[in-house]
């Protein structure tokens, strides 16, 4: 059953190529030129996809948030600014909860990118840019549970984000700014991002005492001190070496003695 479901989805997802038309290009250009935020919206499974698309857009430098149409109907329409644009998802395109949001956007000339699978749907009729998703076969035994339809909608969202990255020349350096945490953040981390430089470096002259060295180690909290002679590095003294060295040397002995 699972293999059959996977096979159905793999086959149906190939239909995604049908959406890469003039409307898709226009949606990229509109989002790239947006002066406000990209507000994604949807109900049910489409709402979950809209949340994910918003999160992806945010991670690639496109300011975005998700707005629940039901909450919008009860006062949250005020979150939408005239500089924003709506990216609304509804596979059928006729979800009743989105109607008030669409009317509000049309009334105040807020641009709408509609993503649906029915050409004459409520959503696409109200949209400035119409993304017509291909109608696909669901992969469950009843053919009714949103499975393939959610997959192809999510695939559209990912393709949209990737195309936008190219349009706005999004780089690894910018991605690092938006994604400092997790495995991705670690993989993007450079030595220069964590290295200690300048006055933060624990440095001491070779003619200073072991005791002076331990004070610098304690102050800088890096576990070691760099020993200099005529501004050239002669070596390092670790916290452990300094503590152990005091057993054999006087704390007033110069560092030269233990180098």
Language-model regions: role of each:
Residues 9, 42, 87, 160, ...:
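Terminal peptide-recognition signature
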Residues 23-27, 72-76, 212-213:
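Short acidic active-site motifs
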Residues 1-33:
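An N-terminal, well-structured beta->alpha segment
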Residues 32, 36-155, 159-164:
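Glycine-rich phosphate-binding loops that contact phosphosugars or nucleotide phosphates
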Residues 171-199, 234-259:
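Tandem CBS (Bateman) regulatory domains
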Residues 228, 233-234:
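Short hydrophobic beta-strand segments in globular cytosolic domains
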Residues 203-221, 246:
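The conserved cystathionine-beta-synthase
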């Amino acid at each position: 059953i699972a293999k059959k479901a996977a096979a159905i989805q793999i086959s149906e997802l190939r239909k995604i190529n049908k959406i890469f038309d003039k409307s898709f290009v226009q949606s990229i250009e509109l989002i790239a030129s947006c002066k406000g935020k990209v507000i994604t919206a949807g109900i049910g499974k489409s709402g979950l996809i809209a949340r994910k698309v918003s999160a992806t857009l945010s991670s690639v430098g496109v300011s975005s948030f998700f707005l629940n149409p039901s909450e919008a109907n009860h006062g949250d329409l005020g979150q939408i600014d005239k500089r924003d644009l709506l990216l609304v998802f509804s596979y059928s395109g006729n979800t009743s909860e989105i109607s008030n949001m669409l009317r509000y956007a049309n009334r105040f000339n807020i641009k709408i990118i509609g993503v649906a699978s029915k050409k004459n749907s409520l959503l696409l009729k109200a949209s400035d840019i119409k993304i017509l998703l291909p109608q696909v076969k669901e992969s469950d035994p009843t053919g009714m549970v949103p499975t393939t339809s959610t997959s192809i909608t999510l695939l559209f969202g990912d393709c949209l984000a990737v195309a936008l990255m190219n349009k706005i020349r999004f780089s690894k350096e910018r991605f690092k700014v938006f994604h400092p945490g997790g495995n991705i953040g670690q993989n993007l981390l450079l030595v220069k991002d964590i290295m200690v430089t300048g006055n933060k470096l624990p440095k001491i002259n070779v003619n200073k005492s072991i005791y002076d060295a331990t004070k610098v180690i304690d102050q800088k909290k890096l576990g070691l001190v760099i020993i200099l002679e005529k501004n050239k590095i002669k070596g390092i003294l670790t916290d452990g070496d300094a503590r152990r060295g005091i057993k054999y040397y006087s704390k007033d002995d110069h560092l030269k003695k233990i180098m």
